[in-house]
């Protein structure tokens, strides 16, 4: 993923205008950046898979497995969540918990209390369950290793370019919207899996579904469609009443 980040930075450095230009031109340059990154990642991954084919079934399977592995982040999700949990529950260390949360979210965490640190952690894990686990698997099953890696490139561009600030307001808009589209179906699959998990754990899954259907059209401070969906779905399953005290800087 570091290589994808470097590739994004390379194209951004070459396509981001040095002088002020029109909003439309900024958007087109950002869109071109996205398309070039996706094309490059797709071609390189396809070439790698082709080499695997030449080496036989076992080499192809090994390369495909490695590609899928690098597009998923289940361990980091669990590690980050548990670390913040223990900082709050065992150590009562709000300062370190705020700092640790700031590493995994694009939000202002400096003044959060214990309750809102917990909420922020749950929201982030709920969202990242989609883009760190379900979406890569979804596109791997549909389009193979190339699909999973192209998805990861699109998601990484959203995290690097999809900010609502002066630099990326128009340049990063295409990247942000593309990420919404890519995660539209996987986000809903994740919700169904959350409901299934709640059912198996004998939690109140019916209430979670009711709240989800009730609030599905409720706008949140974040314009990021997938983020809003997964925050609501995941937190509902976990019986957390979200408060919009966090300041979102993502689309």
Language model regions located:
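Hydrophobic alpha-helical transmembrane segments
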Residues: 1-149, 162-251
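Active-site His/Glu-centered metal-binding helix of metallohydrolases
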Residues: 153, 157, 161
